[in-house]
Amino acid sequence: MNAQVLNLVAALGVMQYSKKLDFTDPQIVYYARAAYVISNTIIFGVYAIIQARINANNDETPLVYEEPAPPFSGQSNGKLVTTTVKEYDSEQLQKAKRSTMMGVAIMAFMHLYMGYAQPLVIQSILPLISLFTNNLVSIYIFNKAAEGSLSRPFAPPAGLFGGGNKPAAAVTGTSSNSNNASAKSDGPTITELNENETEKSS
């Protein structure tokens, strides 16, 4: 099932369930807080495991790809990025951590300052669903091969009805530390494309 659809269905279900809870009851609020803390403990625990496995694999396989231009930037050409599998995965993990910490900060403001308790229940479930549909979790926790929909660079999250274009990727070189977490080439390398363009122009 599409991750966005799964999140939507889960959100609607949890919202309907949370409406039946009496958040004026201190014990209900206590359990909601406990669930939220446990949920985020699991999330950051999984992040720590992934970081350890990224460092252990130390996959220095070169990864070259074109990063799409930001929406509404007026730029037609993307940015050429040269990195390694290890650096790319570490960067993606840091983005996930920042997103989670931002969510915790917003939730803390809503609950501690504004007094809302119902969102604690929702935010105990949805981030866990997002976590276990994350590409890095699929590769480093579930040991799935980094190919197909899991090939690097990762495609942007699809909308409710699919879609989401993936930037063209080229992986060159090999690494002795590469394993199932290594990226796989989806086509000709950037160098090969440039050589073809040079031959045509000459």
UniProtKB/Swiss-Prot annotation:
Source superkingdom: Eukaryota
GO CC entries: endoplasmic reticulum; endoplasmic reticulum membrane
Keywords carried by this UniProt record: Endoplasmic reticulum, Membrane, Phosphoprotein, Transmembrane, Transmembrane helix
UniProt xrefs under InterPro entries: SND3_fun
Subcellular localization: Endoplasmic reticulum membrane
Membrane topology note: Multi-pass membrane protein
Entry-annotated residues carrying Phosphoserine: S185, S201
GO biological process: protein insertion into ER membrane; protein targeting to ER
Primary subcellular site in the record, as a coarse category: endoplasmic reticulum
Transmembrane segments: 34-54, 102-122, 125-145
Compositional bias (Low complexity): 168-185
UniProt-annotated stretches for the region Disordered: 165-202
Entry's family note: Belongs to the PHO88 family.
This protein's name: Uncharacterized protein C589.06c
